[in-house]
């Protein structure tokens, strides 16, 4: 036995003699913990299970360009995020939403759904559904943990994919790219706010264009990404025109 199984948590929980346990954004629990209450243990998860099982469901829903996500309450079982579904709420994702906005939408609804789920369990009106019996449109997509390397922008893609990737990581942990200046020096550039400029061009992906004053745009495979908010190492997040007032960029710069 390791981790939470060997600590004092099971002993502390048993002392409460709880009828029901609720888990939100916590690590995987051993059966000795989640099987303790007579009415079970349920979890609040930020996706429409069985889609996006894993640590970063909100990020991946936005990164993949989904137009809808939601929250799910489900009973815990051995495999992570696979227990029987109790209730779900669907939430739209606007094309301009970043992960922070979607997170806040889900947070506003999460407390209410937890309360409704508790009431239903106590009233013995729950009819939970095994996830394998639920209708799913398309293939199941995972939501693995996001690391720094996950956040690097691949410019050799359509601008829609790049745009969704950036907003799916904004404001945290933030998508980034390496900016190579005309003298060959390179710095990491975090990008937070963008727009799609779907205009065919002959520039190589990663080509940077700027007037040095008001705009920066970077080439994808089928258009440009207009950059509106960004951050240099050791500096605060700035609007593009603010950054250009203090940092010299030329059209000879590239990103990759």
Where are each of the predicted segments found?
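Structured loop/turn residues at beta-strand edges in well-structured enzyme cores
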Residues: 2, 16, 39, 189, ...
């Amino acid at each position: 036995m390791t981790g939470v199984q060997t600590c004092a948590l099971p002993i502390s929980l048993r002392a409460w003699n709880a009828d029901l346990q609720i888990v939100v954004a916590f690590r995987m629990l051993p059966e000795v913990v989640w099987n303790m209450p007579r009415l079970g243990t349920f979890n609040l998860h930020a996706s429409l299970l069985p889609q996006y099982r894993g640590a970063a469901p909100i990020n991946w829903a936005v990164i993949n360009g989904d137009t809808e996500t939601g929250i799910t309450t489900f009973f815990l079982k051995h495999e992570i995020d696979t227990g029987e579904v109790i209730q779900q709420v669907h939430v739209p994702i606007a094309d301009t939403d970043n992960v922070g906005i979607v997170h806040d939408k889900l947070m506003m609804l999460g407390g209410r759904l937890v309360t409704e789920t508790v009431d239903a369990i106590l009233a013995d009106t729950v009819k939970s559904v095994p996830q394998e019996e639920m209708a799913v449109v398309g293939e199941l997509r995972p939501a693995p943990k996001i690391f720094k390397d996950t956040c690097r922008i691949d410019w050799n893609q359509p601008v829609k994919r790049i745009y969704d990737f950036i907003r799916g990581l904004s404001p945290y942990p933030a998508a980034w790219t390496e900016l190579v200046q005309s003298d060959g020096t390179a710095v990491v550039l975090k990008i937070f706010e963008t727009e799609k400029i779907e205009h065919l061009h002959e520039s190589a992906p990663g080509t940077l264009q700027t007037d040095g004053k008001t705009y920066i745009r970077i080439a994808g495979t089928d258009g440009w990404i207009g950059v509106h908010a960004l951050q240099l190492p050791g500096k605060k997040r700035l609007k593009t025109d603010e950054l250009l007032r203090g940092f010299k960029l030329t059209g000879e710069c590239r990103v990759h």
